[in-house]
Amino acid sequence: GSPGMLKFNIIASGISFVEGDPVRFSVDGQLIFLGWVFTKTRDRYAVIDVICYDQLRYLKAQASYCFVGRTAREIIREIAQDLQLTAGDLEDTGWPIPSLIMEEKSCLDIISTALQKTLLATGKLYTFFDDGGALSLREVGSMIATGVVGERSLLTNYSYKTDIDHETYNSIKLARPNEETGRADVFQVTDSGNISRWGLLQLYQSVDTALNDAQVESMARSMLEYHNRRFRTLKVQALGLVGLRAGQMLMLDIPKLGDISLHRLCLLERVSHTFQNDLHTMDFDVQELGE
């Protein structure tokens, strides 16, 4: 995840504000953003460009943590308390992470790692975000946006890409340190068919010593299932939907999208809104579309 950001400019005419001041942005009475001023840039014509961030910005603080048998929700609560941040509705992720040890990492990276481990173990994907000044965690399946974007509704342009360049792997090797032998126990799964098609694309990672053989083997199979494919990415430009945010599911209706026809709910990874001269537009990136 990344902090929510608000950028705007104003003419300096008797307005006085400083870094750290709170900022609220609402549209038609709906609170869209609550954050704080971090950057001010002024030009010779007294126009001030302002950049504000929400509460997730403070999670860039670096720290070291050792968690054993704690759920992602419990980890978020402890970090929020340590940083004196406000926690709101945090959904119970249910699965205790056997071990999570991270040194001198940003708290946002620590939380992201906890959620990634939860995804690999349970298959459940969660969205972590600031909801009007309160840290929130929800399963993506419960965050369905209203509205449709497509050829007959709001869509103005899109960019669709297919590749095997960045996230595609047809061989997974997981290494678990073994203190008794002084060597790593290596678990490997491959797809010989796709190795013949694309060449050997291998991912190698170390895993926690607390995981048993069955858990490591299951993790390797899950990783191969996810990475062993061609990836499809979609970027969309459209007229704006107020309140749409990253982490929500949105219905997209784009027939004849290259090699596929798209009509389904899609997860939004990044959303950017622009309000200018009474016109509201948005750009968003869709999570990889799958085979």
Segments predicted by a language model, with ranges:
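Assembly/oligomerization scaffold segments
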Residues: 1-59, 149-161, 233
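Residues in well-ordered beta-strands of folded domains
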Residues: 9, 24-26, 38, 51-53, ...
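Short, acidic/charged, Gly/Pro-enriched secondary-structure junctions
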Residues: 9-42, 71-82, 112, 239-265, ...
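Non-catalytic surface loops within mature trypsin-like serine protease
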Residues: 12, 54-56, 89, 178, ...
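Well-ordered beta-strand positions in beta-sheet-rich domains
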Residues: 31-36, 49, 64, 186, ...
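Charged- and aromatic-enriched interaction segments used to assemble
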Residues: 44-163
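Glycine- and charge-enriched low-complexity intrinsically disordered segments
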Residues: 68, 283-291
